[in-house]
């Protein structure tokens, strides 16, 4: 049947509107594992069954960086990322965040990075750490490397050469340390990272696996870094503010932990002062934010509104699909952290979510070529 020109124009206009509306309601979520794929598909199916407005489509990425590229290029719309990944997404790819996880339902604070020392060490200052000994949970970890080394760079205690060789700068600065993994091929492909960065490590009970990037090195991880200081093998340990409390009062049955008292330890503050263990909110190296959902700037509102509907439907469920539970997926923290109480809308930029202390820390590493 022939349509008059005016009627045909109206039909075409309506077709375009419907097509644009349908496309605008589709959220393409970039996943990086089989577990994320499955939970994304389950979320999509449950959202459809509940007649939630918007359609979730799952898109596979090879890595968080690949997801950043896909979101920038428009082949994906959203993906949950860690704090350091959020910085890269914003700094290198011009992306932003729509919502962030909240573990207390109020703010987006994940944890504080603190510097622990023995109370008996009366002459210690974070502004005078040259030739001191240090204990780190692991190489290239946020708590054990990025935050403390970034702090030392930003306070002009460490200077990095034109090759941007952080391990050599750190080795030259500290007298000796335990940085598990610093000699692993992944972090030391040429085999020339300073050996003194392993001298406070102790390996296993048979003196093997010294400086290994796994629990066979007894000073590995946050509990290991705490042990390193507790046993007087290091002057300072860089850990989360919860580490001490997670390993005391019988929670850790190893002999070194059972012998430790709260009064034995103190916090070292960035201004050179000291504080007790309960004053982490005012005495810390950085506040590390929770994970957030990375999007294109123009999609902040659209993705937020979709996730708000999803959260209202599946955020607090005790039966059936649960947005903040990973019990059916073989590993924790799939798509979202299991400890998430609520998703918070991010009105500002990605740097406002990351916060000034953490953003400043990350800028110290820009010479490594994030992009």
From Swiss-Prot:
Stretch forming the signal peptide: 1-21
Subunit structure: Interacts with OTOL1.
GO biological process: iron ion transport; otolith development
Biological function: Required for normal otolith growth and deposition of otolin-1 in the otolith.
Pfam families the UniProt entry points to: Transferrin (PF00405)
Gene: otomp
Species for this entry: Danio rerio (Zebrafish)
UniProt keyword terms in alphabetical order: Secreted, Signal
TM region positions: none
Protein name listed in UniProt: Otolith matrix protein 1
Subcellular location(s) of the protein: Secreted
UniProt domain Transferrin-like: residue ranges: 27-367
GO cellular component, one term: recycling endosome
């Amino acid at each position: 049947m022939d349509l008059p020109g005016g009627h045909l124009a109206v039909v075409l206009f309506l077709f375009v509107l419907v097509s644009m509306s349908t496309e605008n309601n589709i959220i393409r979520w970039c996943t990086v594992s089989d577990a994320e794929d499955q939970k994304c598909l389950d979320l999509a199916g449950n959202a459809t069954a509940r007649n939630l407005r918007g359609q979730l489509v799952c898109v596979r990425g090879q890595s968080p960086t690949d997801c950043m590229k896909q979101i920038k290029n428009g082949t994906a719309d959203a993906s949950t990322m860690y704090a350091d990944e959020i910085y890269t997404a914003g700094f290198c790819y011009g992306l932003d965040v729509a919502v962030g996880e909240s573990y207390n339902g109020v703010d987006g604070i994940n944890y504080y990075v603190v510097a622990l020392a023995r109370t008996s060490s009366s002459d210690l200052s974070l502004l005078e750490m040259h030739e001191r000994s240090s204990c780190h949970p692991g190489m290239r970890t946020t708590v054990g490397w990025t935050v403390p080394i970034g702090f030392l760079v930003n306070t002009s205690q460490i200077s990095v050469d034109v090759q941007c060789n952080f391990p050599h700068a750190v080795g030259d600065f500290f007298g000796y340390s335990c940085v598990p993994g610093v000699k692993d091929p992944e972090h030391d492909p040429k085999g020339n990272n300073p050996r003194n960065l392993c001298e406070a490590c102790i390996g296993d009970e048979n003196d093997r696996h010294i400086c290994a990037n796994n629990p066979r090195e007894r000073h590995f991880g946050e509990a290991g870094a705490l042990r390193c200081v507790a046993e007087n093998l290091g002057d300072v340990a860089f850990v989360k503010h919860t580490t001490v409390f997670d390993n005391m009062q019988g929670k850790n049955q190893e002999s070194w932990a059972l012998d430790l008292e709260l009064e034995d330890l103190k916090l070292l503050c960035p201004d050179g002062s000291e504080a007790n263990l309960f004053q982490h909110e005012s005495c810390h190296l950085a506040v590390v934010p929770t994970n957030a959902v990375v999007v294109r700037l123009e999609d902040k509102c659209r993705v937020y509104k979709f996730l708000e509907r999803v959260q209202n439907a599946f955020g607090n469920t005790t039966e059936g699909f649960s947005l903040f539970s990973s019990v059916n997926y073989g590993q924790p923290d799939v798509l979202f952290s299991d400890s998430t109480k609520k998703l918070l809308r991010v009105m500002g930029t990605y740097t406002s979510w990351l916060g000034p202390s953490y953003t400043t820390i990350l800028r110290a590493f820009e010479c490594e070529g994030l992009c």
